[in-house]
Amino acid sequence: MDTGQDHMTTPGIRKIDALASRGDPPETVAIGYVTGESTPIGFSFVSSEELVPPRLEYVVVAGMRERRGDTTVTVDLLAQVTNITADVITLDDRIDFLGAETVLNHRVTFPPRLRVEAAVVGYLDSDQQTVRAARNAVLPGTRVHLAPDELLRKFFARSSGSSITLGTLMNRRTVEVALDPNGLSRHLAIIAQTGAGKSYLAGKVLEELLGLGATIVVLDPNSDYVQLRKLRGDEAVPYEHARKAPNHDRIQLYRVPIAGRQRYPDDLCGPSSRYTIRFSGLDGEEICDVAGVPSNAERIREAVVNACIRLRRDRVDFNPRFLAQHLADFSGVPLDDFDGDATDKGAGTVAAHRPDLDDAAAQLDLIRAIDHATTVTVTKRERGDNHSGPTPPRATGSRGASVDDREMVAARSALRYIRKLEKYPIWSQSTIDLNAILQPMKLTVLDLAGAEKGVMAYTAEWLLSNLWQRALGGELTNPVFVVLEEAHNLVPGGRETTRASRIINTVASEGRKFGVFLIVVTQRPSKISDDTLSQCASQLIMRLTNPDDQKAIQRASEVVSQSLLDDLPGLNQGEVVVLGRLTRVPAMVRVGGRVGAEGGADINLIERLERSRKEVEDERFASRRTPPRIVAPIKRQPFS
C-alpha cells in the first residue's frame, strides 16, 4: 500500500508554507476571529480566502482563562476544524440565474464570507501530559491561529523508545503520531472495509510492537503476514536473496501443509514449520466441531464421542481414517461406501439422515430409517454377506426398535463427516509446541490459508484456552498479544457461535487482568459479537461505508460521534482514525511506511493481464518461426 507521504502535499501544509512566506511564523498570524455564539465544546470564526484552514486542520486560541481549583490559569486551547461554509451577500440562495448573471457581469459582487466551525479538543495541564476539557466558552472577537507544530507534538507525540509510531497527522506531515502501548491493555480493534489498508496497518502495528519486546501470535487466514521477515519492496524476491527486516530472526512461521493451494510459495516466505494437530488429542466434541457436525445433531455427536471413548479405552493413538474405520465396523457397513460427500453411496444402507434429530418429524424419520436398516442388516446376515466388525448385541428400545440399531444409524451418519477429515493435511502425531510460541520478543504467524473454518475455530480455541490456563496459573511471564484476523468468522454476533466464541469473549472481558490481549481485525464489525467488540477500548478505524458496520462501532464505543461516522466514508486509503486509550485525544492519521514486506496487497490486474498477453504473443511468434509441416498427398485408390 502506497501511503503517498513522499509526494503528497496537503492543503494544511500549503497554508502553513504560504503564511511562512510572509516572513512571520504561521502561529503568529491570525487566520480568523471568533463570531456568533460559542460554547465550551465549540465555536465559529470568520476567515478569508487566503487564510482559511482546511477541514480537519488544528487551530489554537491563545490566552484562554480556565479555572483550576482555587486558581485561574492561562492556557492555549486546541480545536479542530469540522466544517467550512462560504457565501456572498449578493449571491445568496434566493437569487435566480438571470440575477446571478447580472451581478457577475456588472461586477457588483462582494468578497465571499468564509465561516469556519471548530470543535474544542482541550488544553494541556501543567504537567504537559494530561489533556483537560475546557470549562469556559471562547469570547467573540478572539483571534484564532493555526496550531504550531510544537504544540501538536505535545498532544500526539511520545518518547520514541516506548511508543508505537503510527504515522503523521493527516494535515501535518511534520507532526508524528505515536501510540501509547498501555492503550492496548484493554484490547484493540482494527476496523476497515476491504481495500482500505487494514492488513498493512496491522502489520505496521505488529512490527512496532515486536520492536518493543512483545510476544505476538497471529491467526492469519489469508497469508497477509507471511512475508514480514523481508524488507518492504522485496515481496517478489525469494527469501534467500531478499533483504531482511531488522527483527527477522524473532519472527517464525507455521504453515498448513497444503500443496498447490498456498497464496505464496515457500521460497518467497522463507523457512517455516508445519502447523499440525494431534488428532487423537481432540475429544469427541472437538472432532465434531472441526468436522462440521451441527450442534443439534445430538445422536451423531454421541456416536463420535462414544467411538473416541472406546478407542482411548483400548489405548489407540488414532487418526481420522482409523476413527472412520471404527465407526464403519461398529455400524456394519463397508468403509468405502462413505467417501466424505454429502450423501452415502451404499445402496443397502440409509442414504440420508437429517442432523436435527430432536424434533418430532426427525424422530419419526429416524424410526423409519432404523426399521429399514434393521431389515437390510438381517437380510444381509441371512444371505451370508460379509460385513466387517463385530455384530453388536441387540437391545429393544421403547418403540420396539433396537437401541444398538439407533447407534448404528447414527454411526453411519457420522461417517459422512469423519471421512471429510481425512482430506485435511494438518493431522499428525503431535501438536505445535506452545512454549516455542510464547518466547519473549517473538512474533509467530500461523498461516491458516486453505484450512477449513472448523480448523481455524479450533486453532483459536486451542490457542486461547491454553494461554488462558497458563495465565490463570500465573505461568505467563510476559504479555501476549493474540491477533484475530477475520474475527467475525471466529466470534460471530447474534445467535451464531463457533467453538472459539466462548473463550474469545472470556479473554475479551478478563484477559487484561492476566496479561492476554486481543487485537481484533475485521471488515464487518456488524457481524462480530458485541461482547468482544465492546471490550476493545481502543480502535483504529479506516474507511467504512456500510451503515450497519458504522452503527456497530458506534454501539461498541463511547467516543464515536455521529460527526466522526460521517467522516469515515471520505477517508482515503491509508488514512485512519485513532480512538480510545492509544492517544491523549482522537487523531486522524496518515499511516507511515512500514519496514516489513506486505502480504495482503491486492493483485495488480494490469501486470497480470500484460503477462498473460505476452505469453500469448510469445506463443504466436514461436509458431510463426516454426516451418510448416509438409504432409505427403494421399494417393486416392480407385473404387473397385
Q: What would you call each of these model-derived segments?
A:
Residues G213-V217, P440-L443, T477-F481, K513-I519:
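Loop/turn-to-beta-strand initiation segments
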Residues R499, T506-R590:
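Conserved ATP-driven motor cores of ASCE-family P-loop NTPases powering translocation/secretion/packaging/pilus
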Residues G574-S640:
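Conserved P-loop NTPase motor module
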Residues S199-R261:
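Walker A/P-loop NTP-binding active-site region of P-loop NTPases
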Residues E208, S223, Q227, G233-D234, ...:
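P-loop NTPase motor domains
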Residues M1-Q193, Y200-E207, L212, Y225, ...:
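Basic- and hydrophobic-enriched, low-structure N-terminal and domain-boundary segments
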Residues I190, T194, E496, P525:
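The conserved Walker
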